Amino acid sequence: MKFTFIKSLLIAFAVSLFSSFQLMATDMHGVMCGGEIRPADQAVVDQFMSDNPGVNVTMEAVPWGTCQDKVINLAIAGDPVSFSYVGSRTLKGLAENGHIVAVDIPDSQKKMYQPGILDTVSYKGNIWGYPHAFSTKALFMNCGLIEQAGLACEGPQSWDELYSMAESVKNNTGAAGIGLTGKDFDNTMHQFLNYLYSNGGQVIDPATNAITLDSPNTVETLEFYAKLANVSQEGPLAWERSQLTELFNDEQIAMYINGPWGAGQHKEEL
């Protein structure tokens, strides 16, 4: 089968309140996945504390690799955070186990979201978080390496074309054709979903909430992901997503998938 150029539109993040009793607490603890407290987030917290004298809010920045596990484990242990900036994919499980409270978004605010966005944080008739970020994934290409392999630097329009391009680079240059990750679940899942969504696959049927990972789309994607290991850097099981950017900058891989932030992390000549 042939598929269009790899590009996935993903709802990446959501914010939820953990534990209703903590809303009345004088001390509130929030976890922000991503490793940093952004000025805009701090400004909101500062304004909240100003509007609510006697309430103290502390925020903790945790890298994505460990953040969601930490939030979930705290909730399971009975010591949930008051709020957290996490991936929307975690909300269904947290809601099922009673670890988060539903949110009430006014109709006037619902109209601000694009169609389908709120579905990513909805489950059994309730909304469990505020969608915050919407990320597009793209295939970044090193034209120098691709042209060195004797090819035109044009985006592949199918998986067959992608593999053929990566294979030509690996066979005709000193670089790998494409960057692949598999060091741990978080890294592997994110990269795999990029390919799954581009193949028309999904994890959960939005209409029935049925798990659809046993679909033909998933099987095809698994087979292709495994095949890519033949043209990737050596030992993809040892690599994290963030390290692919370094490999790309060092011209050790000709292509890899990343979000739009990747463009600002590349060397100017690339």
Predicted regions and their residues:
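Glycine-centered hinge/linker elements that transmit conformational signals in sensory
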Residues: 165-168, 207-237, 267
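Extracytoplasmic/periplasmic solute-binding protein
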Residues: 128-132, 137, 161-210, 217, ...
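Bacterial N-terminal signal peptides
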Residues: 8-20
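Conserved N-terminal structural module of periplasmic/extracytoplasmic solute-binding proteins
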Residues: 21-93, 107-111, 237, 262
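Short, solvent-exposed loop/beta-turn-alpha elements that line the ligand-binding surface or hinge
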Residues: 101-115, 179-183, 199-220, 267-270
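Hinge/lid segment of periplasmic solute-binding proteins
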Residues: 88-138, 160-163, 188-191
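Alpha-to-beta junction loops
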Residues: 75-86, 174-176, 250-258
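Short helix-initiation/N-cap motifs at beta->coil->alpha
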Residues: 61-70, 89, 157-163, 236-250
